[in-house]
Amino acid sequence: MGVHLEVFRLSTHWFLAITALVTNGLQYEAIRMISPKMLPAISAYAVSGLYLFQFNGMRQAMAISIFVFGVALILRGHRFGWVFLLTAALIHSSTLIVLPAFILSRRFQQRNTFNIRIVLLSGGVFLALLLISTALATFLTDLVGDKYGSYLDQNMGSGRGRLIHLALMLMVVWFLQSTELPNQLRCATRFYSLGLGAQVVGLQLAVLDRVTLYFVASLPMFICFLLAHGSRARHIVLWLGIITYFFISLTHYGDLIPYEWTLS
């Protein structure tokens, strides 16, 4: 980020302000393009962890917002949305891990989600291979760069906040399976369901846990449909889960990525 400050000759305050405007502005536009109701969508964005993350991971937060904006364009039928996805990859290399998942989510168009058990099992198998396979760890290091890849050699958990988030994602995917959705939106919900696998990996490797945020970014797009179906009790449980995770993020952010298990 220091390079950008020198190139554009911006003060730190102005640079932070412009970055925040771009990050949140693109997220807002993506939500506006897809969600028929803004209040629940913006509320979900504010308390799902995405908003707080940008205070700690500014560059990746911008990449996520560009990625989500591109996804929204693609869902609206605009092929040049792929340009934004590639741009996001240029800004932060973690996007390269997520791109194949989005491409996969464009298949099986009649399904709201992928099979939960298969996704969880795939995440567990990938984590096991990553922990025992030097070749796979080396490949990911080359993909995301030495700055982040060096963390793959370390056995780092992501705290109890990640367990709560995994439970929240499981609940959302379970609710999605019984929710009527527009055909164009099913790609986003299938993509979100693949985030379960990323979160399983993130339970043990904090650096890959941040990849989960790309999947979480699609939640504001479809949350109003979750709230339009099911009982009031289901809606209350959903919001309680989201708000609980938000307060853990807000009051004890260090417990989300302390590089050790806090349950022990």
Regions found by a protein language model. Give the residues of each.
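Transmembrane helix irregularities
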Residues: I74, A89-H92, V201
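Transmembrane-embedded, aromatic-rich helix segments that form part
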Residues: G81-F84, S94-S105
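Short hydrophobic/aromatic helix or loop-helix immediately within or flanking a transmembrane segment
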Residues: M1-L10
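Signature aromatic-anchored transmembrane alpha helix within multi-pass, membrane-resident enzymes
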Residues: R117-V125, S231-L250
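Short acidic/glycine- and proline-prone juxtamembrane loop motifs at membrane-interface regions
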Residues: F55-A61
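Membrane-interface transmembrane helices that cradle and orient dolichyl/undecaprenyl
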Residues: F67-F80
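Transmembrane-helix signature of polytopic, membrane-embedded enzymes
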Residues: A17, Y28-S48
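Alpha-helical transmembrane segments and terminal signal-anchor/GPI-anchor hydrophobic tails
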Residues: L99-V216, H252-S264
